[in-house]
A protein has these predicted regions:
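Structural motif
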Residues: 88, 129-131, 241, 282
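Rhodanese-like catalytic fold shared by cysteine-dependent sulfurtransferases
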Residues: 23-73, 99-128, 140-225, 251-282, ...
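Short, compositionally biased "basic patch" segments
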Residues: 38-48, 85-98, 239-251
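Short, surface-exposed ligand- or partner-binding patches at beta-edge/loop junctions that are enriched
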Residues: 133, 286
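Bacterial N-terminal signal peptides that target proteins for export
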Residues: 1-11
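A short acidic-Thr-Gly-centered motif at the start of a beta-strand
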Residues: 77-85, 232-236
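Short hydrophobic beta-strand that contains or immediately precedes a catalytic carboxylate
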Residues: 79, 88-93, 106-109, 241-245, ...
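Bacterial N-terminal signal peptides
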Residues: 10-20
Length: 346
């Protein structure tokens, strides 16, 4: 056979092999002796119809959890500067606590009554800001998330609550910080659970707005079931699916044993990510202070997850470490100097 013919046959064979390789693109091949096996891509898990209606409804109505406004927090200083006719402060603490001292002009509305108050007692959008105040900023963050999801885009949670407003208030933050479990921190990277379905909501509704309405109001009366203490979690961390809602470098420096990192700004409202949160387990969400995790918990509970926010976040179990690494890791450890001395009235 001539060199030209050999070259022609070589080109033809090479082309055929190239075509075969191109046709198999996107599939993983494994050579086993003379046998080539092909692995198909994992089958995508569909979510139930009501969960799909709800997530599509929220995405079409502002997609709050993936907006710049999430989470909607305001610190004491800008809150104080904003006080006036165009700012309404809604204090959600118990009436007997409210009477002992509150921000001037504040109204006292407990969390279960918030939806009715916003719908019937005020015209919310006449205000530039509506600031929710509680004891430590934990419950007000949860309630703010729910109100924001309802479309009230001018609601904010007072960071640190009344504990950060005036030193004479009952300082829940001073009582909530601890370094008790620093020696138990883990640096292992844990993987997310396999994808599965969202929780079944069973509202019987067939439109996204209807599913949302059926789910959102009861959550205002369920906050007591939406929180958990560090002592409880560290006693049996294996009982929970623990979500670390922090930057990767903060996760890597030490986290609750078994905790899995979920990316802030890359989890909520994203079906593939939320599918890895087990529908049949108790979920614990934590961050640095408990504020962000309260927002996340409210959203997850809307979808039927048995989620709980860890009160005071990392401050509740690794406070000393947060202070030591504050500069390098940009932690937010609570200090008594974080509490301002703004006026209160009775």
């Amino acid at each position: 056979m001539s060199f030209l013919k050999q070259t022609s046959y070589g080109i033809i064979l090479a082309s055929l092999f190239g075509l075969i390789a191109a046709c198999s693109g996107g599939q993983k091949q494994q050579a086993q002796g003379n046998t080539v096996t092909t692995e198909a891509a994992p089958k995508q898990v569909e979510i139930n119809s009501e969960a799909k209606l709800l997530i599509d409804y929220l995405a079409a109505n502002g997609d709050y959890v993936n907006s710049r406004e999430f989470p909607s927090l305001i610190s004491a200083e800008p809150a104080f500067e904003a006080l006036g006719e165009k700012t309404l402060v809604v204090d959600i603490r118990k009436p007997e606590v409210f009477k002992k001292g509150h921000i001037k002009g504040a109204v006292n509305v407990e969390m279960p009554d918030l939806p009715g108050y916003f719908a019937e007692k005020i015209k919310p959008f006449e205000y530039d800001k509506i600031i929710l105040a509680c004891y430590s900023g934990q419950s007000s963050s949860y309630a703010t998330a729910l109100l924001r999801l309802m479309g009230y885009g001018n609601v904010y949670s007072l960071r640190l609550g009344m504990s950060g407003w005036n030193p004479k208030m009952d300082n829940k933050w001073a009582a909530g910080i601890s370094s008790e479990y620093e020696s138990k921190l883990d640096t292992t990277t844990f993987e997310k659970a396999p994808a599965g379905d969202f929780p079944l909501l069973n509202t019987g509704k067939t439109a996204g707005a209807e599913v949302f309405d059926a789910r959102i109001i009861p959550l205002f009366s369920d906050y007591e079931n939406a929180t958990i203490a560090a002592d409880t979690v560290f006693a049996h961390p294996e009982k929970y699916y623990i979500i670390n809602y922090e930057r990767k470098d903060k996760y890597d420096t030490g986290h609750i044993p078994g905790a899995i990192r979920y990316k802030p700004g890359g989890t909520l409202g994203i079906i593939a990510e939320m599918q890895t949160i087990p529908a049949d387990k108790e979920i614990v969400v934590y961050c640095g202070t408990g504020h962000n995790s309260a927002f996340v918990t409210a959203y997850l509970r809307l979808f039927g997850y048995n989620a709980k926010t860890l009160r005071f976040g990392n401050n509740a179990f690794m406070h000393n470490k947060m202070i030591e690494d504050e500069t390098t890791m940009s932690w937010q450890p609570y200090r008594k100097t974080d509490t301002k001395n703004y006026p209160v009235v009775k």
